[in-house]
Structures are given as structure tokens and as C-alpha cells.
Curated annotation (Swiss-Prot):
Facilitates flavin adenine dinucleotide (FAD) translocation across the mitochondrial inner membrane into the mitochondrial matrix where it acts as a redox cofactor to assist flavoenzyme activities in fundamental metabolic processes including fatty acid beta-oxidation, amino acid and choline metabolism as well as mitochondrial electron transportation. In particular, provides FAD to DLD dehydrogenase of the glycine cleavage system, part of mitochondrial one-carbon metabolic pathway involved in neural tube closure in early embryogenesis. This is Solute carrier family 25 member 32. One of its GO terms (cellular component) is mitochondrial inner membrane. Belongs to the mitochondrial carrier (TC 2.A.29) family. Keywords: Membrane, Mitochondrion, Mitochondrion inner membrane, Repeat, Transmembrane, Transmembrane helix, Transport. The gene is Slc25a32. It is a multi-pass membrane protein. It comes from Mus musculus. The keyword Membrane applies. SUPFAM superfamilies: Mitochondrial carrier (SSF103506). GO terms for biological process: folate import into mitochondrion; mitochondrial FAD transmembrane transport. The chain crosses the membrane at residues 26-46, 89-106, 123-143, 185-203, 227-243, 281-300. Disruption phenotype: Embryonic lethal. At 11.5 dpc, the majority of mutant embryos show neural tube defects with exencephaly or craniorachischisis associated with multiple acyl-CoA dehydrogenase deficiency. Neural tube defects can be prevented by formate supplementation in early embryogenesis. It is found in: Mitochondrion inner membrane.
Length: 316
């Protein structure tokens, strides 16, 4: 097939995918992402602080989760615990909204005209594709979030509090580091789509298996408690498999240290800290992401079903 023919075939495939988009998925995903991140942002801050804790004198030393929270509260108060909340909420809301938006469109495209459910690998690939598309749009927000979270209160140099807020950070990163600065951590972020892919695959399969086990239709709506259980199990599975990339990504995005790239981060982390360095911050991360995932998925499922019901009532 010629390049022109391949391009036309690719365009036709994407057009077919976008025929399946439903804005209910976007709205429901944004709702879930925003609510969960507002509720649990301080734990995300702790996770980032621990992830980049590599022994440098420029950083405060924390003895544990509670000590970290107490130190931030003592130095900066409630505002300190919500450092970086604006890009985090924007990023999480947009990411979850786009993820559900793209994922459901891709999944609907692949199941069109099929009687049977997707295979596990098809769920995995669909979620990975949705994750890559989402990351291309949202990576600058994650860089900004990390930079804002790593402005330590009480440190000596004023330059370490160089950003006034999300938009100021976006402008300054672009001004001094260009587009490349806004896309720091993009490569490990792409590897990180495996996290979402594994989570969505596990989530879909657990829902299907559970409904089959209790003799319900495969796509039957679950109760809130059932959604929480399925979401928690799928999240724990995904975190256990993919956490090290988050440490690598956070260190690449850290303004206090300059690394030569992904390989340089991995080499230096392994040499100085061993395998434990790749799992720094996993405890506060699990404590945060498991309930955050449960909130996100419960809100998403209920809001999306509500909006779909509204659409059906309008049609009828």
C-alpha cells in the first residue's frame, strides 16, 4: 500500500472512531477527576516530595507521611498542603475526562458489529491508545504541577519559589525551557500509559466476571459498593506493576536537579538508592490513589449513567 493509501486508511479509521464519541463520558470523567483530586491533593503532594527525596541538602527531610504533612502545615499552613492544586485539578479533570472520552470511543469502535466482548489484550491496547492521546494534551499541566509542588517553604534561596501559580509556571517554563521543558517526563509518561491500560483492563474484566458470577448481564450497572471494590482491586494491581516510572518521571520534571534523560535518572537512582529508590513514596501514593480511584470511578459511572438516561429520555 502506498503512503497516500495508508494515510487515507488511517484517516478513515480515526473518523470511524470519532463517530463513537460521547460527551457524557467527557463530562463524567472530568467530574470524577476533579472531585477525587480536591479531596486527596495533600497526599499527592507528599508522594511527589518523597519521590524526589534523593538526599540533597536543598530539600527538607521527612521522617514519614505524618511528619511530612505536619512540616508543610507548620511552614505554609493549609495553602502549603494545596501547593500545585490548580494544575493538579485541571490536569486530573482533563486527563480523566479525555481518557474516558477516548477510551470509550475506541472500545465502541472495536466492538461495533461484534456479539462477543473484547479480549483482555484488546482492552489493554484500547486503554493504552487512549492514554497516549491524553498525555499528548496534558503533559504540560503535569510538569507545572510537579514544579509548583516542589517549591519548598522555609528554604534559603528565593529562586526556589520562582512560580506564582499555574499560568505563571506555564509561561516561565515555555520562556526559559521551550516546548521541550513543557514535555519533560513525556517518554516515561508514555510508559506510564501501561498503568492506565493495566488498570482499565483489570477493571473491565473484573466487572464482566463479577456480573457473570451473579448471573447479571455483562454491562449491568453495579452498586456503589461493587464499583468501589472493583476500582480498588484494579488500581492496586496497576500501581504494584508500574510505580517506578512515576519516580523517574517526577525526577525528570524536578527543577532542582538536572538529569541527562531517562537512562541517567535510572542509573543514578539505582547507584545511590538501589531498588528502594524506585519505590519511594509508594505508601502515600497507595493511600491516596486507591480512594482517589474509587471516588473517580464511582462518580464517573453514576454521572455517565445519569447523563445517558437523560439522553434516552430526550430521544423518546
Amino acid at each position: 500500500m502506498t503512503g497516500q493509501g495508508q494515510s487515507a486508511a488511517g484517516s478513515a479509521a480515526w473518523s470511524a472512531v470519532f463517530r463513537h464519541v460521547r460527551y457524557e463520558n467527557l463530562v463524567a470523567g472530568v467530574s470524577g477527576g476533579v472531585l477525587s483530586n480536591l479531596a486527596l491533593h495533600p497526599l499527592d503532594l507528599v508522594k511527589i516530595r518523597f519521590a524526589v527525596s534523593d538526599g540533597l541538602e536543598v530539600r527538607p527531610k521527612y521522617k514519614g507521611i505524618l511528619h511530612c504533612l505536619a512540616t508543610i502545615w507548620k511552614v505554609d499552613g493549609l495553602r502549603g498542603l494545596y501547593q500545585g492544586v490548580t494544575p493538579n485539578v485541571w490536569g486530573a479533570g482533563l486527563s480523566w475526562g479525555l481518557y474516558f472520552f477516548f477510551y470509550n470511543a475506541i472500545k465502541s469502535y472495536k466492538t461495533e458489529g461484534r456479539a462477543e466482548q473484547l479480549e483482555p489484550l484488546e482492552y489493554l491496547v484500547s486503554a493504552a491508545e487512549a492514554g497516549a492521546m491524553t498525555l499528548c494534551i496534558t503533559n504540560p499541566l503535569w510538569v507545572t504541577k510537579t514544579r509548583l509542588m516542589l517549591q519548598y517553604g522555609g528554604v534559603a534561596s528565593p529562586s526556589q519559589r520562582q512560580y506564582k501559580g499555574m499560568f505563571d509556571a506555564l509561561v516561565k517554563i515555555y520562556k526559559y525551557e521551550g516546548v521541550r521543558g513543557l514535555y519533560k517526563g513525556f517518554v516515561p509518561g508514555l510508559f506510564g500509559t501501561s498503568h492506565g491500560a493495566l488498570q482499565f483492563m483489570a477493571y473491565e474484566l473484573l466487572k464482566l466476571k463479577y456480573n457473570k458470577h451473579i448471573n447479571r448481564l455483562p454491562e449491568a450497572q453495579l452498586s456503589t459498593a461493587e464499583y468501589i471494590s472493583v476500582a480498588a482491586l484494579s488500581k492496586i494491581f496497576a500501581v504494584a506493576a508500574t510505580y517506578p516510572y512515576q519516580v523517574v518521571r517526577a525526577r525528570l520534571q524536578d527543577q532542582h536537579v538536572s538529569y541527562g534523560g531517562v537512562t541517567d535518572v535510572i542509573t543514578k537512582t539505582w547507584r545511590k538508592e538501589g531498588i528502594g529508590g524506585f519505590y519511594k513514596g509508594i505508601a502515600p501514593n497507595l493511600i491516596r490513589v486507591t480512594p482517589a480511584c474509587c471516588i473517580t470511578f464511582v462518580v464517573y459511572e453514576n454521572v455517565s449513567h445519569f447523563l445517558y438516561d437523560l439522553r434516552e429520555k430526550k430521544v423518546s
